[in-house]
Amino acid sequence: MKFFTLGGKQFWEDVFYYQKWRIQRHYRTKKYRLLDKWDICRATGSFEECRQAFVQMVEVFEIPRQTGSLVILLHGLGQNKSIFRPLWRALENEGYQVAAINYPSTRKSMKAHVDQLDFFLTHVEDIDEVSFITYKTGCLLLRHLLNTSYQWTTKFNIGKIININPTNTGSDFCNIASNFGLFRFIFGPMLKECTPFKAKRIPKLPTGIPFGIVFCETLKDRILKPIIKRYEGIKIPGDLTEEDFSLNYTHLKNKHLNVFDNPKLQEKCIQFLKQGKF
């Protein structure tokens, strides 16, 4: 069985990754499929059947063994892994192994996404260190993940963490949109979980991990800013700001529709992964 796919988007979740090959699970039917690095489906069935099919493909395609560290990219609500394409290419050009993870952010709760990532990390092979780069609300998902005890935490070290345009204090857009049924239908249960009220309840990232933040405003951010400003709640003196979550942060100018097309942002991410500082 071979057919081209679009890589999952909002209906398939990544549960296994090895040298750009991935096993995905459909969020509703729970069926699995094996995709090669060109997003061509090579097998379907249970996870074990897809895993066994991959083992056979290792010999057929002479897939090399992966070693060392892996950089995992986590997108935000309503997005998919494709948004990271310019960044993951830049990272690969620097020799990094990169896994941009698809998760159906508009279909399931944050707890369900954390369970998916737990399954994914449990099945990571031949890696001794994992670093994370998150975008927008992906930072909240990572905080949930790293503050829960899992078996995979003894398999490898957590290297470095980069938040890009994070919503660690919660999203004012999600707060406004959650009041409207249409937006709740479009964005799903995670919409309410990304509001400032809910974000405050999520523990911060564990200490001791090099953690940096990149602020790089997008065109959409500039368009939405006056609208959000008009309807946002009252800011209480002493409330945390995004800068309060890390002493290591940087602000970048941006003229690109996709923030990851910004060469300066790519440079800063590579710099932090190498040095642990901007």
Summary of predicted features, one role per range:
Residues G76-L77, E217:
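Structural motif
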Residues P206-F278:
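C-terminal catalytic-base region of ester-bond hydrolases, centering on the histidine
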Residues F84-P86, H144-L146, N175-I176, K225-I227:
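Short amphipathic alpha-helical segments
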Residues I83-F84, A112-H113, L265:
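Residues at alpha-helix caps and immediate loop-helix transition turns in enzyme cores, especially N-
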Residues K81, R107-K111, V259:
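Loop/helix-junction capping segments adjacent to catalytic residues or to phosphate/diphosphate-binding pockets
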Residues F3-L6, W12, L182, I186, ...:
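Short, aromatic- and cysteine-enriched interfacial helices/patches
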